[in-house]
Amino acid sequence: MLYAGLDLSRKRLDFHLLDGDGGTVEVGASPPDADGLRGLTQRLERHGAPIRAAIESMNGARFMHDRLELAGWQVEIADA
């Protein structure tokens, strides 16, 4: 299992991917649209592990949640 912290802004989705011991696996960003999320999930598939993510509740978080869950991620929306 890998763990992703997601930070959504109007222009991009930043992510920090951690392993089970808390070590950084990958850090990056993606456009916050359907094509960007598709590219992000395809990019992170190469790690070969399920991903559990958290994203702050804000405009666009539900869209991110739904798209990433369709790609097989487990996503939680956190209230700030």
Predicted feature descriptions by range:
Residues 1-80:
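Phosphate- and other anionic-substrate recognition elements at nucleic-acid/protein interfaces
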